[in-house]
From Swiss-Prot:
Its cofactor is K(+). This is Betaine aldehyde dehydrogenase. SUPFAM superfamilies: ALDH-like. Its EC number is 1.2.1.8.
Amino acid sequence: MSVYGLQRLYIGGGYVDATSGKTFDTFDPATGELLAQVQQASAADVDRAVASAREGQREWAAMTAMQRSRILRRAVDLLRERNDELAAIETRDTGKPIGETLAVDIVTGADVIEYYAGLATAIEGLQVPLRAESFVYTRREPLGVCAGIGAWNYPIQIACWKTAPALAAGNAMVFKPSEVTPLTALKLAEIYTEAGVPAGVFNVVQGDGSVGALLTGHPDIAKVSFTGGVETGKKVMSLAGASSLKEVTMELGGKSPLIVFEDADLDRAADIAVTANFFSSGQVCTNGTRVFVHRSVKDAFTQRVLERVKRIRVGKPTDADTNFGPLVSAAQLDKVLGFIDSGKAEGAKLLAGGTRLTDGHFGSGQYVAPTVFGDCRDDMKIVREEIFGPVMSILDFESEDEVIARANDTHYGLAAGVVTENLSRAHRTIHRLEAGICWINTWGESPAEMPVGGYKQSGVGRENGITTLEHYTRIKSVQVELGRYNPVF
């Protein structure tokens, strides 16, 4: 018997049964308890969802921007009213501490919808005079039906981030959440319907990567917004281009550097480093896992980090006092433990953690201790590859030029941070770092107003911020001739 029962698809403003006859299970990573059986979408189901979205999009786009804005604002109110209920589901599905999901996941998702609801009426074209009796004007028109493919680490937040600009601009979206954490996207669909979003404008199809491929290759999808790993992102981009030259937005992986200079407030730097590595049990794409510390302060900094790691409260995610929960799945646990073994084998010095936690109630969950490695080298696997778990690598450096070159020596470019009391050096360093999201003397906040996305193989395009709205529209140029037409022939 599962906690939440059978989960169906959400198409055309309500729940429908999948035609595949297949289901998959989702489990509580803290206890191993079966949370739900989820119906897997078939190709026919994806076609049905896209057809429903096309129909709903025409009605949605025909509304005024002010009407769409009001409906989205109602959805925001409903999200906030149901914050505690949604946070409880998210905690069971992801293993995140309840204090985290209550304060972050739904709150930040609602903030982004509210932000774009406010911008819906600000979508404008241009008027360009050519001569006395002729001018050009432009219209920003919706793309049509977009596909959203979510990651497992921030299920409802990612669904909000992807739907908000799409819907504000007059598009519809067919969304596929990760099969690892599939529950809260369905609740968002319920909320949009209750708020007044027309049937079909937001549909949810469940399943593994094969369902994502069906969406990415569908001829009636105009744009794909994907969050996930680099290798999968490359496949998405290839299929999107080969099928119908779809537009793409992709937020992919990272191996982000955090640079601590010799003049840094070391207590502040240690607080930042611990947050940048262990928030959400290290399952955050922007994690600052390569911690470069000036050699003169490395020992003092490391001592402060280890003191803070000892204060991390690992426990049941449903306990209010817990601030560090399990990894999302057994597969992710195995992956992280493999990286830890690699760090030990390659000569990194294990300073904290490094083991699976199995005592008591930990034994039934996917828990790994917060892990810190010292004496790391740039060529180590734990330094070069994305782990997506609670593993910090500390490296030392001597000069500014050296650390910038080493920080940039990666095919990732998602995030970077600098801790220093010298603001001139802070800005100078940040401007030379090849990363799309940067922080000075802080880490991790991504407000609705801030465009987020990566350089290099960490992504294409941006989410959030004003400019993202433009990428959910296409420009139509119109010339108007008021005077006499001068024929060529």
